[in-house]
Amino acid sequence: MIRKEKFGDEILKAHILVEALPYIKKFSGKTVVIKYGGSAMLDCNLKKMVMQDVVLMKFVGLNPVIVHGGGPEISSFLKKLGIESKFVNGLRVTDEKTAEIVEMVLVGKINKEIVSMINELGGMAVGISGKDGKLLKAEKDLSNGDLGYVGKIVEVNIEVIEMLIDRGYIPVIAPVSFGDDGKTYNVNADTAAGKIAEALKAEKLILLTDVEGVLENVEDKTSLISRMDLEHAKKLMDSGRINGGMIPKLKCCIKAVENGVKRAHIIDGRLTHSLLLEIFTDEGIGTMIGKECFDDDNL
């Protein structure tokens, strides 16, 4: 009893490692696309913990691919220049000047900060944008009217990502994309992550958000849906109970699973080590979406 009390913390750590073992075995060599955004990008401690999770995933055999946003930092930079941020249905109105600033902030600042942090933690990251290696080809998105240089992805060339993964690197992708017209397009990071996950036939697509996951009742924080098959997810969308920023995220997950991604996850990026908790524990912490009904495990 004395020894158990003395080594209590160490025993707990050992139990956690044992619980993770089947997941490490199951996902070894598999690709996981992570959309990194929200509070996890703004809080220094959360930022470090997310990158620690990513590096650990790589060391235990998974192939993480990060796709990041940066909306708040873009808005902050625009404000310093006296440029007002305008949005239509959550999409940033992007004129030529704004497009230049979006590219500068996403590719030149945020992307390199993420790469530096991963490298400092012992990983090997390479930062790229959708322009590099013709990764993300886009055209003007007119679904919400003409918002300027807002694009929709029409083609994904995963060759550069696969090359980086094969050589042991962690790809970090800014969703600034190119068009056949020679223009630069600002593409929604959730959408870009979903398209990349589909093209890679990823094991998992994980969206880090500022909510617990998908709620059955948005007014009831205890109504988290931990697992959904596609039929359930589509019915929930059609019911009108999903609103706000969760609509495009759930749509993105549904489409990804329909197009070959095995599991899509919407998790709370405000929780410490949320990626590890979702991937390597029996219960997980957010909402997991799959094509068919789930067994009793989190695999």
UniProtKB/Swiss-Prot annotation:
It is an enzyme of class 2 (transferase). Keywords: Amino-acid biosynthesis, Arginine biosynthesis, ATP-binding, Cytoplasm, Kinase, Nucleotide-binding, Transferase. This is Acetylglutamate kinase. The lineage of its organism: Bacteria, Bacillati, Bacillota, Clostridia, Thermoanaerobacterales. It comes from Caldanaerobacter subterraneus subsp. tengcongensis (strain DSM 15242 / JCM 11007 / NBRC 100824 / MB4) (Thermoanaerobacter tengcongensis). Pathway: Amino-acid biosynthesis; L-arginine biosynthesis; N(2)-acetyl-L-ornithine from L-glutamate: step 2/4. Substrate binds at residues 70-71, 92, 186. Its main location: cytoplasm. The keyword Cell inner membrane does not apply. GO terms for cellular component: cytoplasm. It catalyses: N-acetyl-L-glutamate + ATP = N-acetyl-L-glutamyl 5-phosphate + ADP.
